[in-house]
C-alpha cells in the first residue's frame, strides 16, 4: 500500500507491504465555514467576551503587536494585516505601531526572515523589530525575588496585542500561551 503522509513542510510518500496494514484511521469530517484570513477577520469582527479591538485602541496611543519568532509556526503574515486594519479603523497612525518579534533566547532575524514571517505589507508599513534582552525596563520582582524585565518598546506602549500559538514542546510539555 502506498500512502502520502504529512511530514515537515512537504508530504512524504511511504510504501507499506499490504500484509502489514491492519487498517487506516481517518478523522471525522469537520464542517468548516471559513478558513485563513476570512476566519481571522470574522474573529476580529466578533470577539468573544470583549469589545472589538478598534473600539479598545485610541488615536494617539502607541500600539505594539507581539508575535512569535521564526522558530514557531504562527502565520503572522496572515494574522497581523487584519489586526492592523482593525487598528487603523480606530484612527491609530502607522507611526504609532510596532511589531515585536519575541526572540526569547533565539537569534535575531534577517530582514528576509522578517518579510517571510510578517509579509511585505506589514514589514514595509510599520516598524518591525526583534526583542532585545539588553534594552529592558525593570518592572519589579516576583514574590520569590525574580526580576521582571520587559523589552522597553513593549513596556512603553499604551496597548499590547499578543499573537501566538500553543503547541507540543519536546521537553517543556507545551510551548506558547502565557510563556
What is the meaning of each model-derived region?
Residues 73-92:
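Histidine-anchored nucleotide/phosphate-binding helix
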Residues 1-43:
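N-terminal amphipathic/basic leader segments beginning at the initiator methionine
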Residues 96-106, 131-135:
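Short, glycine/charge-rich beta-strand/loop segments that flank catalytic centers
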Residues 62-73, 98-104, 162:
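Short glycine-rich or small-residue beta-strand-to-loop segments that form or flank ligand, phosphate
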Residues 48-64, 89-95:
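Glycine-rich phosphate/diphosphate-binding loops that line cofactor/substrate pockets in enzymes
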Residues 48-51, 82-86, 143-153:
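Short alpha-helical segments and helix-capping/turn motifs at coil-helix boundaries
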Amino acid at each position: 500500500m502506498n500512502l502520502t503522509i504529512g511530514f515537515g513542510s512537504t508530504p512524504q510518500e511511504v510504501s507499506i507491504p499490504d500484509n502489514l496494514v491492519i487498517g487506516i484511521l481517518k478523522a471525522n469530517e469537520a464542517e468548516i465555514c471559513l478558513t485563513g484570513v476570512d476566519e481571522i477577520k470574522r474573529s476580529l469582527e466578533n470577539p468573544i467576551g470583549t469589545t472589538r479591538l478598534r473600539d479598545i485602541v485610541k488615536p494617539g496611543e502607541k500600539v505594539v503587536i507581539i508575535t512569535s519568532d521564526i522558530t514557531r509556526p504562527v502565520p503572522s503574515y496572515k494574522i497581523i494585516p487584519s489586526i492592523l486594519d482593525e487598528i487603523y479603523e480606530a484612527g491609530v497612525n502607522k507611526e504609532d505601531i510596532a511589531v515585536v518579534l519575541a526572540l526569547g533566547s533565539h537569534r535575531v532575524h534577517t530582514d528576509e526572515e522578517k518579510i517571510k514571517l510578517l509579509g511585505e505589507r506589514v514589514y514595509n508599513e510599520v516598524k518591525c523589530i526583534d526583542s532585545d534582552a539588553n534594552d529592558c525596563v525593570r518592572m519589579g520582582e516576583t514574590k520569590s525575588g525574580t526580576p521582571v524585565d520587559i523589552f522597553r518598546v513593549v513596556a512603553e506602549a499604551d496597548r499590547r496585542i499578543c499573537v501566538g500559538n500553543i503547541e507540543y514542546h519536546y521537553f517543556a510539555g507545551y510551548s506558547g500561551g502565557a510563556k
